[in-house]
């Protein structure tokens, strides 16, 4: 069994990543895509202000989408965890149902809904709230909406798991000692649910930087993410070495985020043990 698992990991994880790393140090060739000539130019190109700006823009968009998911997801997860046990499975089922549909199809549906002639603008015009359609599509806001729409369930699930495990007697003790609802939330609930918050933020932020089809469909050419750069290099420009170098750089950034999560989790566990 162990040999099978190790073989599967080597064949489908280790070797493909090794090929990408190797390709990132090679030279582009118009005929065969890759020339077996070692170079570091692919990584030095990433220091160009254009690509560095795209990377920072991707981090910024991913951070905003993560914060939006946290603000929207925490109250929903709290509401879900406080419902009767008989009702929770139904709402959890409704939360998971969208995963049965391809996310690309869902983004197309959202694009139709938010377009100038879409249902949202038509409804606002009918109410008399606006006189002319609001331009939402092909803006940074549209990309954020698309990312939140796709990734919100990834925030809700770990938050729900953490909130459900809250020690109720501890909350009751805080009330008995005169703590207000705000004090209880800040000093007890948030620290106890911090593992879920960190896990949810990672589950949202890591894929948010690479969902190129969201920025393609919702943001247009002026709102590119680093995932779009990788896609263009592999599929359009056919510069596989530079695309591989960009992929490795993105992987390193994600790895650093995972390292921060691991360190934060260890510190939280030590703090809980001391208390």
UniProtKB/Swiss-Prot annotation:
SUPFAM superfamilies: MetI-like. It is a multi-pass membrane protein. InterPro entries: MetI-like, MetI-like_sf. GO terms for molecular function: ABC-type polyamine transporter activity. The chain crosses the membrane at residues 1-21, 61-81, 90-110, 136-156, 188-208, 242-262. Residues 82-89, 157-187, 263-275 are cytoplasmic. Keywords: Cell inner membrane, Cell membrane, Membrane, Transmembrane, Transmembrane helix, Transport. CDD domains: TM_PBP2. Required for the activity of the bacterial periplasmic transport system of putrescine and spermidine. This is Spermidine/putrescine transport system permease protein PotB.
